[in-house]
From Swiss-Prot:
Free-text function comment from the UniProt entry: Component of the ribosome, a large ribonucleoprotein complex responsible for the synthesis of proteins in the cell. The small ribosomal subunit (SSU) binds messenger RNAs (mRNAs) and translates the encoded message by selecting cognate aminoacyl-transfer RNA (tRNA) molecules. The large subunit (LSU) contains the ribosomal catalytic site termed the peptidyl transferase center (PTC), which catalyzes the formation of peptide bonds, thereby polymerizing the amino acids delivered by tRNAs into a polypeptide chain.
Record-given protein name: Large ribosomal subunit protein uL18
The organism of origin for this protein: Styela clava
UniProt keywords, alphabetically: Cytoplasm, Nucleus, Ribonucleoprotein, Ribosomal protein, RNA-binding, rRNA-binding
Compositionally skewed regions (Basic residues) per UniProt: 262-271
């Protein structure tokens, strides 16, 4: 079939149908969403859970959600900006931070449903593949499917770091090792040691050492926050090791405290009825005084 020019006549505009709003905005891939949301017909009202991973310039968002007609329902969420509470104060958007955020999400979710003691996940992190298995006589493992949105799913992408953290934390997420750092596409071999290095920030510490040797000014400029918080290339792995242990110890979200400070008010406070009445009396009195002085 050759090229057919679209004739934009009355019939074209009469039958024209706009795409969904979030497709027009370029925010949702509905081809992928349909497959992530639609549940098997023989499972009736059972929700199909998704592990949603999104990256901003300064944060990582991990959520467990399921779809309803009214909109998606988020049952649990974890953010990279919570990591300073667990000792990770710098590099909140790298691969190691993504792993920590995924681990925090899974431990928080299992704690919420009372499954954290049944499914502990991978306590000794080695970077190798790990799949949680159902325990006989106990509730099944919590199953979720990775939702990466519009992110590119290249080998070594950070979204898979968050997924690996959640899988090691005890969630049942179907996956393979083909997209983890350390996988060689040509030979098909997977190096768990390389992946473990990324989980503990080894790639960051290696770059810190290289940059410090080559250009100290550039090192001070790029790693200024690391220097400020006393994090060196040799202490990066220790920082993440302690963070993993702290997350497992207490994954619950921090309770919001009531605002104790004094609020600033920039506009005038609304007057009461009695205040308005007195104001009118004062204006009348001042007007009469001015008239008397003129007379």
């Amino acid at each position: 079939m050759g090229f057919v020019k679209v004739v934009k006549n009355k019939a074209y505009f009469k039958r024209y149908q706009v795409k969904y709003k979030r497709r027009r905005q370029g925010k949702t891939d509905y081809f992928a969403r349909k497959r992530l949301v639609v549940q098997d017909k023989n499972k009736y009202n059972t929700p199909k859970y998704r592990m949603i991973v999104r990256f901003t310039n300064k944060d990582i968002v991990c959520q467990i959600a399921y779809a309803r007609i009214e909109g998606d329902v988020v049952i649990c969420a974890a953010y990279a900006h919570e990591l300073p509470r667990y000792g990770v104060k710098v590099g909140l958007t790298n691969y190691a931070a993504a792993y920590c955020t995924g681990l925090l999400l899974s431990r928080r979710l299992l704690n919420k449903f009372g499954l954290d003691e049944i499914y502990e996940g991978q306590t000794e992190i080695d970077g190798d593949e790990f799949y949680v298995e159902d325990v006989d006589g106990k509730p099944g493992a919590f199953r979720a499917f990775l939702d990466v949105g519009l992110a590119r799913t290249t080998t070594g992408a950070k979204v898979f770091g968050a997924m690996k953290g959640a899988a090691d934390g005890g969630l049942d997420i179907p996956h393979s090792t083909k997209r983890f750092p350390g996988y060689d596409d040509e030979s098909g071999d997977f190096s768990a040691e390389v992946h473990r290095s990324h989980i503990f920030g080894g790639h960051v510490s290696n770059y810190m050492k290289e940059l410090e040797e080559e250009d100290e000014e550039a090192f001070k400029r790029q790693f200024s926050q690391y220097i400020k918080h006393g994090v060196t290339a040799d202490t990066v792995e220790e920082m993440y090791t302690k963070a993993h242990a702290a997350i497992r110890e207490d994954p619950t979200p921090k309770k919001k405290t009531d605002f104790a400070g004094k609020t600033k008010r920039w506009n005038r406070k609304k007057m009461t009825f009695s205040q308005r009445r007195d104001r009118v009396k004062q204006k009348k009195a001042s007007f009469l005084r001015a008239k008397q002085q003129e007379g």
